[in-house]
Amino acid sequence: LEGVHKSPKGREWLPFVVRLYFYGGSEQVKMVHSFVYDGDQNKDFIRALGVRFDVPMREALYNRHVAFSCADGGVWSEPVQPLVGRRILTLDKTGNGESSLQQQQMEGKRIPSYEAFDEKNRALLDHWASWDSYRLSQLTADAFSIRKRANDNNPWIGTFSGTRSEGYAFAGDITGGMGLELHDFWQSYPSSIEISDAKTPVAALTAWIWSPDAEPMDLRHYDNVAHDLNASYEDVQEGMSTPYGIAR
């Protein structure tokens, strides 16, 4: 698949090629995305670049889940609406058996529908926070962060940090979802994986090839004067020190 990126104002630049690989008997799809820089290095800076997928969300907020890989095989996961607060959620006066509803939720089990709870417990569900967006960002080779926010009008807050994430994310509900792995995630920093619109019927899962959390991609030469070949192997010549045509 070949195409070109188009800005909201209509400008077309950064041609790309997408290759898709399908395997018999497997639900996995491999996608290879390549793009070519064809801009002006002195004025065209890439703020962010990514590939976005839609993920249907069919269940109640507390039956929706997100997860990110951390370092050394670790996983960070959370429900879109965690069932935790000052009061314990219960189904009836006798309790909920061997484990709490909050524990069952963390184990990925189905929590009963809203209508199954009495008025007191519905009030808890009505007032507990839910989260719309999550972002895993690897901005250096040795540090990643996981942040989340409730909505577009409020700030991102930190939830976890570590060294080198393996670049995997999941978004979905207890009936299914979508997993995504960005190859060479920490090696190709600054990169991010973002889950947004998690509280809507269709969430977005975005693999950021260049993270919006980082400084814009600046492909200019590091200096504007020559440093003499006798002193160092560097030179600056008109039309020579240019990134035009490089690809990733």
Predicted stretch roles:
Residues L1-R248:
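Beta-strand/loop-rich accessory regions of lumenal/periplasmic or secreted enzymes
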